[in-house]
Amino acid sequence: MVFAAPCWVPPLPSDLPDSTTLEEFIFCQVKDSQTRSELDRSILICGTQGKEYTVQESMERTGRLAQGLSAWLDWPQKPSEEDWKVAAIFNINCVEFFSISHAIHRLGGTVSAINASSTADELEAQLRLSNAQAIFTCNTLLKIAMKASQKVGIPLANIFLTDAPGSYRPDDVYPFQEIDNIVRTARSSLPLLQLGRGQGSSTPAYICFSSGTSGAQKPVLLSHQGIIANIVQINTFEKFRQKGPNVSLCILPLAHSYGLVCVAYNALYRGDRLAVLPSSDVEDLLSIVEKLRINTLYLVPTLLSRILSGGKAGGHDLSCVKEVYTGGAPLHPMLGEHILRHHPTWKTKQCYGATEAGTAVSVTSDCDLWPGSVGCLLPGVQAKIIRSDGSETTKHDESGELWVSSPSLAIGYLSNPLATEATFTVDNTGRTWLRTGDEAKICLSPNGNEHLFIVDRIKDIIKVKGFQVAPVELEQLLLSNDFVEEVAITSRQDKRGEERPQAFVVRTHEGLKEPQDAVSESLQALVKARKARYKWLHPHVIFVDSLPKTTSGKIMRRALRNMCPANSEVNGRLSSKI
């Protein structure tokens, strides 16, 4: 049984551009649809420094940056699989992200978006996986970028700086090039890249990292046409909702496909002004919402919880807020109930997607709000629910693995055909399906609309603050400790009701000689030293005599989760916090 968008959702246009870059699609349509006075209106706003760019300024800046980078990196303007050009953006959120990205795209290159919280080891791994030849970063992250680039062989000359604030500037070691200087000294402006017919679907625009259905981080190739398709899908679904240009806020990491596609590019396509904030500081967020009168927020549940906790929202005028979209992780029911009680005018809407899907798969509509649902399928998306025996479900309310097909699907994983083949499957009609690894079901709402519900994650990936954490990544690290014989990582809620990696450890003979607290502290310190903050362990390591396993030797993670304290106890503490 194949499911699709509700009948009241307009159909997806059949003429999605297949020879257009993202920059041309976003900015040229805005440029063509606006009056001269509107073209002088800012579309990009730096939320901290107040710097603004119009459509004209953004495209001119991009062209000059592309010209300068072409000469500096010796990159000709052409897309070519033989001449693979990849530049990594390892930076906090900033408005320069788009000029850099589009300049690389004008050169026929691909942008590898890397989370700013990555450690030097993690950055090194992702630079290798993406085959990056240049890095764009800021002063704050420069030391990490230098360490990782040295290990992968990227020359210091290929590290470029934005003007984000920071103190680490080893100019006495190397005079790093700044973006503003390249733009200022460029002799001309490089024009838009002209893709050939059909190249939009085969030319990667971005590499975003995902753990897929299992295993460590893998580079996902998102094409120009795939991202364009997802933007059109979202806007077609929300066509009846939009009432003229708005001010949107991007506080979610642009290295995450949710922040990149669903928030940033979606807003720019609508003609919104996009305010970009570099961090998830709650006070900064609330202040800019109040100042710019932002009425739609795109958040992850953990950030929403921080906004509502401790009465922080009470000190600001948030009467402008009408809608709150959450994605990246499930919305805790108690958090939804809190919003209903204290902010009844806010429409809280969940959405669902995956990096491999090109991001969004389903979105909640004003027409049919249903608590717990992640909304209705977007136009052009087809879904089916696959039972454990491989057969398709034939009715509503039956759970199984969610498979989706969409024009926005990723090209696949870079240089990993086995993982691509395992995740993307082609049926006998030639249609490609993404195996999401998520257990889901389709249910009919009281209004008769089909809604998607995510039941559980079949895959072992843990979601922390919207970011994916692969258990195997932490397990391999912990096994390097002399006190660890065996280890399994699963998920557990902390006292705030947020998901954290939970370690179950079988100690070695040497480990048994040490106090449990000492071993626990050793393991916590190891993870904190080597991994990003969102990968840090739950404070309480659980020590066991053995790990529950199947007859084939596979760890039974669900049995381990059942050994954790009951969620009801955790939830009770959460309710006292907000």
From Swiss-Prot:
UniProt keyword annotation of Acetylation present: no
GO MF annotation: an example: ATP binding
Group of enzyme by EC: ligase
Transmembrane segments annotated in the record for this chain: none
Positions of the UniProt region annotated as SBD1: 281-350
Keywords: ATP-binding, Ligase, Nucleotide-binding, Peroxisome, Virulence
EC number: 6.2.1.-
Organism superkingdom: Eukaryota
Knockout mutant characteristics: Abolishes the production of AK-toxin and impairs the pathogenicity.
Pfam family, one: AMP-binding_C
Region annotation SBD2: where it falls in the sequence: 351-413
Intervals of motif Peroxisomal targeting signal type 1: 576-578
Note: Gene clusters encoding host-selective toxins (HSTs) are localized on conditionally dispensable chromosomes (CDCs), also called supernumerary chromosomes, where they are present in multiple copies. The CDCs are not essential for saprophytic growth but controls host-selective pathogenicity.
Compartments (UniProt record): Peroxisome
Protein name: Acyl-CoA ligase AKT1
Biological role stated in the UniProt entry: Acyl-CoA ligase; part of the gene clusters that mediate the biosynthesis of the host-selective toxins (HSTs) AK-toxins responsible for Japanese pear black spot disease by the Japanese pear pathotype. AK-toxins are esters of 9,10-epoxy 8-hydroxy 9-methyldecatrienoic acid (EDA). On cellular level, AK-toxins affect plasma membrane of susceptible cells and cause a sudden increase in loss of K(+) after a few minutes of toxin treatment.
Binding-site list for ATP: 210-218, 350-355, 438, 457, 554
Gene: AKT1
Species in which this protein is naturally found: Alternaria alternata (Alternaria rot fungus)
Gene Ontology cellular-component annotations: peroxisome
Entry-linked PANTHER family: BCDNA.GH02901, LONG-CHAIN-FATTY-ACID--COA LIGASE
Main location: other
Pathway: Mycotoxin biosynthesis
